[in-house]
């Protein structure tokens, strides 16, 4: 898979997300006409994805531990049923990003949102009653201002390079994010909605500090974007994170964590995609009102 980045006359320039060995002049290219998208819905927490949002454990089951080109797996489980509880009712007015219901996902209430690409005001026509449904089942039908009906499901896709802008204005950071690392909280405080960095040479303890912050920070969701790191560090992250205990619940920290990993040996375009995918997932949970540490 690749992405067209420039068109000049009758020639298109592409960046490829996978290895290009064996590709030669004269090979056929199929244009699917879609942007690189992330699938958003219940079932993301606890997953380990690559930059294209393929669940790596399922890819390993399908094709082995060495990634092959052209192997793609659904990002979210199609057969798992979720306990749907509607909150919207017929006649309600909704816009993109509004919640129409919820399902439990781990320790959180996962809000089912109106897809971000539905522009304008919509009227709820019907809502599926509470029960167990898959992400491919229709949970509501809304009508746009022209009278056209749109079926809403629990999951939808969104281009990773488009910001999730379903808000009126960005609030200025004013509340501290307590990391429980006294050195950071005292001398280098971090605010919710802000950014910070951990610079340092090899072996300085950047990954250890990252794990400590992820485990103890005053946040709801943790998303790890292991982009362009050495394979050893990525393997260390994948192995150690499921073993970390959440101090709030005493259970695995992975229950509220998502890992997106692309090692330094992957193509540059793939590593870039992992950053955009991670940010998109973080913005999705932010839209639910949750605090996300990326």
Across the structure, where does each feature detected by a protein language model lie?
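Peripheral, non-AAA+ core regions of ATP-driven protein-machinery
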Residues: 1-187
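Switch/coupling sub-region of P-loop NTPases
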Residues: 177-294
């Amino acid at each position: 898979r690749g992405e067209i980045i420039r068109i000049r006359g009758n020639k298109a320039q592409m960046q490829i997300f996978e290895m290009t060995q064996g590709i030669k002049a004269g090979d056929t290219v199929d244009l699917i006409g879609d942007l690189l998208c992330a699938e958003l819905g219940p079932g993301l927490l606890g997953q380990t994805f690559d930059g294209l949002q393929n669940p790596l454990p399922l890819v390993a089951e399908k094709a082995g531990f060495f990634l092959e080109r052209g192997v793609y797996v659904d990002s979210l489980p199609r057969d798992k049923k979720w306990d749907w509880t509607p909150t919207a009712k017929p006649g309600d007015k909704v816009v993109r990003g509004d919640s129409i219901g919820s399902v439990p996902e781990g320790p959180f209430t996962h809000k089912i949102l109106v897809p971000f690409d539905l522009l304008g005001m919509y009227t709820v026509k019907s809502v599926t009653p509470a029960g167990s449904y898959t992400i491919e089942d229709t949970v509501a039908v809304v009508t746009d201002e022209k009278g056209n009906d749109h079926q809403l499901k629990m999951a939808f896709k969104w281009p990773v390079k488009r910001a999730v802008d379903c808000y009126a204005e960005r609030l200025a950071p004013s509340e501290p994010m307590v990391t429980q690392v006294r050195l950071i909280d005292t001398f280098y405080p971090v605010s919710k909605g802000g950014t910070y960095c951990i610079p340092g040479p090899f072996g300085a303890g950047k990954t250890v500090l990252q794990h400590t912050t992820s485990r103890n920070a005053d946040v709801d969701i943790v998303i790890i974007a292991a982009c362009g790191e050495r394979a050893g560090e990525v393997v260390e992250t994948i192995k150690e994170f499921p073993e970390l205990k959440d101090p709030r619940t005493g259970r695995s920290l992975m229950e509220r964590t998502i890992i997106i990993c692309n090692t330094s040996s992957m193509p540059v375009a793939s590593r870039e995609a992992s950053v955009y995918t991670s940010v998109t997932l973080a913005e999705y949970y932010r839209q639910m009102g949750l605090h996300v540490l990326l």
